[in-house]
Regions:
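Conserved beta-ketoacyl condensing-enzyme motif
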Residues: 9, 52-123, 244-245, 250-276
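Buried hydrophobic packing segments
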Residues: 59-66, 98, 125-132, 222-226, ...
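Acidic, glycine-rich active-site loops and adjacent beta-strand->loop/helix elements
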Residues: 13-15, 82-89, 116-122, 146-152, ...
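C-terminal catalytic subdomain
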Residues: 302-310, 325-405
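Condensing-enzyme catalytic core mediating Claisen C-C bond formation in acyl metabolism
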Residues: 1-52, 158-244, 376, 381-459
Length: 459
């Protein structure tokens, strides 16, 4: 049986709100030490929404722009799936709202639905779409995957790690960014590090230190499973194919990926995570030279102890600094300006990477992608650059797009948070946030009627 080749991401689009918060101003506003957010977390600014936007309006903007920017026929789409952790309805999906973009063309045969598990939903939707194209159920049409979220916190200390936005991706065969089928490691388990059990509020319950520990532990688990799968593939074929480079013979994951993008709650966590991969490579190695530069007292740490050992953390970050600057730093340039976009975070990081490397030299490179969703669901997987990425880079124009946002004051941000808090769960509600700074053609929430039905307008 023949399968479609190079199934993956054919096109990408991103939508971010028209305004953002300057983190250096927020430091002053909150009375914390200078650099706590900008240096300590690596965050420059943060997207945020007023009561005029919700997860559906963000998605409407990203998908409508994807269709128009790439001149995609709505009837050429056979699957539409949304990853989100910001739904406001326990029954009606975000995807169902997006069907309004396809019905005018007569397309009501869209498979797929919402998928939810914290920040992992977008990745699960991507895997589902790729699997659909590669299956006997495929009808020959492309799929669209949407990752849309709004991150906002009740606790003052957590608010700098908020964000908002949506990434939409066209999925199909002969893609310039194809999923490497044999480069994947998954780790899933049970934890209460971050969750949203209270449907009366928009805010999560967060155990910050535990969530970071879970993130790093999940990366370890994905690393281990990836190594097991690659070893199985190597044992069967004794060759390196399907995106696995010949130099993987070294057994080092650090040698496997040319570039990497991570789910980015904050940018400092990304540098720590990249260093953690080096530590895992050392643990896997039988060569004592692999531990060069790492103090002897760190060689025999128990796993749980290693997750919180600051000396180890600083050591591996230092040892990987040069490689990080080349292979990973391009992926955090946009997230540092956007904040945490939850399900869209990893794919904002991917767009950032593509936008800040030389597109001409990217073909043939393997990008490592680490997706993490609290609770816990996580996967470390590979995307192979199998075509020209320049069209995506040029049409998204990411960094220039971010530069056009209005930089709000902390007071304006706090007012927006207050509006959202008052509006959440309301009926008979008319939003009062301004639409003045929204670009022409932007979808926004117009009203919520007495039956909680939402109406969206377009500027």
């Amino acid at each position: 049986m023949s399968y479609p080749e190079n199934v993956g991401i054919k096109a990408m689009e991103i939508y971010v709100p028209a305004q953002c918060l300057d983190q250096s101003l927020f430091e002053i506003h909150q009375g914390v030490s200078a650099g706590k957010y900008t240096i300590g977390l690596g965050l420059e600014s943060m997207n945020y929404c007023t009561d005029r936007e919700d997860v559906c309006s963000l998605a409407l903007n990203a998908v409508s722009s994807l269709l128009s920017t790439y001149n995609i026929d709505p009837n050429s789409i056979g699957r539409l799936e949304v990853g989100t952790e910001s739904p406001f309805d326990k029954a009606k999906s975000v995807k169902s709202v997006l069907t309004q973009l396809f019905e005018p063309a007569g397309n009501t045969s869209l498979e797929g639905i919402d998928t939810v598990n914290a920040c992992y939903g977008g990745t699960n939707a991507l895997f589902n779409a790729v699997n659909w194209v590669e299956s006997r159920s495929w009808d020959g049409r492309d799929a669209i995957v949407v990752a849309s979220d709004i991150a906002i916190y009740k606790e003052t200390a957590s608010r700098p790690t908020g964000g908002a936005g949506c990434v939409a991706m066209l999925i199909g065969p002969n893609a310039p960014l194809s999923l490497a089928p044999n480069v994947r490691g998954t780790y899933m388990t049970h934890a209460y590090d971050f969750y949203k059990p209270d449907f009366s509020v928009e805010y999560p319950i967060v155990n910050g230190h535990e969530s970071i520990r879970c993130y790093i532990s999940a990366l370890d688990g994905c690393y281990k499973n990836l190594q097991e799968r690659l070893q199985q593939k190597h044992d069967k074929s004794n060759t390196s194919t399907n995106g696995v480079k010949p130099d993987y013979e070294t057994g080092r994951v650090m040698d496997l990926f040319d570039y990497m993008a991570f789910h980015t709650p904050n940018c400092k966590l990304v540098s720590k995570s990249y260093g953690r991969l080096l530590y895992n490579d050392c643990l896997m190695s039988t060569d004592e030279a692999a531990w060069q530069g790492i103090p002897e007292e760190l060689l025999n740490l128990q796993h749980q102890e290693s997750l919180t050992n600051k000396i180890l953390e600083k050591t591996v970050v230092s040892l990987t600094k040069e490689a990080f600057q080349t292979r990973v730093e391009p992926s955090i340039l946009a997230p540092s300006k956007c904040g945490n976009m939850y399900t869209a975070s990893l794919y904002c990081s991917l767009l950032s990477l593509l936008s800040n490397i030389d597109a001409k030299d990217a073909r043939g490179k393997l990008i490592g992608m680490f997706s993490y969703g609290s609770g816990i669901a996580s996967t470390l997987f590979g995307i192979k650059v199998t075509g020209d990425i320049s069209e995506i880079v040029q049409k998204v124009d990411l960094m220039n797009r971010l530069a056009r946002r209005y930089i709000a004051t902390p007071e304006e941000y706090e007012e927006a948070c207050s509006l959202r808090s008052k509006a959440y769960g309301r009926k008979n509600y008319t939003p009062t946030g301004s639409v003045e700074r929204m670009a022409p053609g932007t979808y926004y929430l117009e009203s919520i009627d007495e039956s909680y039905c939402r109406t969206y307008a377009r500027k």
